Amino acid sequence: MRTTREPVTVQVAVDPPYPVIIGTGLLGELDELLGARHKVAVVHQPVLAETAEVIRKRLADKGVDAHRIEIPDAEDGKDLPVVGFLWEVLGRIGIGRKDALVSLGGGAATDVAGFAAATWLRGVDIVHVPTTLLGMVDAAVGGKTGINTDAGKNLVGAFHQPLAVLVDLATLHTLPPNELVAGMAEVVKAGFIADPAILDLIEADPRAAVDPSGEVLAELVQRAIAVKADVVAADEKESELREILNYGHTLGHAIERRERYRWRHGAAVSVGLVFAAELARLAGRLDDATARRHRTILSALGLPVSYDADALPQLLEYMAGDKKSRAGVLRFVVLDGLAKPGRLAGPDPSLLAAAYAALADEDAS
């Protein structure tokens, strides 16, 4: 796979198709992608105010009436009051149907700005500029938008494909190491469900896999985005196949909710991946070596592979509200082999308990 620092484009073949442009120093591409717009709103997280202002000024120099809208960081920005605030500001500045939004930030910014774009005037264009690894390989690609409520994570949302996605790898240099590592959980997920070469690259040199200066991480980003683009093209609205992108997320979302979103999404998904692998192994669907490989790869990256031993009853309660459930029946994405995702519906409580026991952290109780 091409890994030079020249821009690489991955096409997401939905209707209409759109590009995910991967490279460095890509902000200059934004003007051309947006085209002729009267007004543009740049939705950004606080730490990116300076970059957002650079974008705003650049657009203003082109004659665009450009505005910055700051939203809270991380999961604090993914709720109805924040969306209501965005609607209010979009109305005040007069964003019309021919205008556009730009999201600048991590996955939470992509989710909430995308939801605002999907619902404002029943849909306006948006370009995503993800600045975290998680945003690049997951949230910004595929058109899923959403917010959190007391009922659960991402249960309120809409499908709204972006006009384009700009993945500027240079922004990874600004991430705290633990934020970069957390994003690797989604990369590992892509490897297990569809592209084992991702796993080989990480195992060969885990340290290089999280080095934003190297070519290994650049290739991992490209490969993970390509996996998601292929799945989204085959099943845009998550009628069936796209569910495989939720591998590890059933327990992961429950952990996030139990932790009141203080855990990073990737950290929770990492534990969820180990749990899903144990479920499949104990159900006789996944070989021991591949199940064990989950734990070794995630651990090598510095991601968590265990959780509070006493938490299962509460986690089961939260998982019951998972969007993959059907008629109250709990469903998991599992593996029937490497890069062979399947489903496990209505697992016996004893199986759930045994799988959880395999990752329970007695010290966290």
From Swiss-Prot:
Cofactors named for this entry: Co(2+); Zn(2+); NAD(+)
Pfam families, A to Z: DHQ_synthase, DHQS_C
Residues that bind NAD(+): 73-78, 107-111, 131-132, 144, 153, 171-174
Cofactor binding summary note: Binds 1 divalent metal cation per subunit. Can use either Co(2+) or Zn(2+).
GO cellular component: cytoplasm
Catalysed conversion reaction: 7-phospho-2-dehydro-3-deoxy-D-arabino-heptonate = 3-dehydroquinate + phosphate
UniProt keyword list: Amino-acid biosynthesis, Aromatic amino acid biosynthesis, Cobalt, Cytoplasm, Lyase, Metal-binding, NAD, Nucleotide-binding, Zinc
An annotated Gene Ontology molecular function: 3-dehydroquinate synthase activity
InterPro entries named in the record: Dehydroquinate_synthase, DHQ_synth_AroB, DHQ_synth_fam, DHQS/DOIS_N, DHQS_C
EC annotation from Swiss-Prot or TrEMBL: 4.2.3.4
Biological processes annotated in GO: amino acid biosynthetic process; aromatic amino acid family biosynthetic process; chorismate biosynthetic process
Pathway field: Metabolic intermediate biosynthesis; chorismate biosynthesis; chorismate from D-erythrose 4-phosphate and phosphoenolpyruvate: step 2/7
Binding positions for Zn(2+) per the UniProt entry: 186, 249, 265
Compartment list: Cytoplasm
Gene3D superfamilies the UniProt entry points to: 3.40.50.1970, Dehydroquinate synthase-like - alpha domain (1.20.1090.10)
Source taxon at top rank: Bacteria
Family: Belongs to the sugar phosphate cyclases superfamily. Dehydroquinate synthase family.
Function: Catalyzes the conversion of 3-deoxy-D-arabino-heptulosonate 7-phosphate (DAHP) to dehydroquinate (DHQ).
Name this protein carries in UniProt: 3-dehydroquinate synthase
Primary gene name: aroB
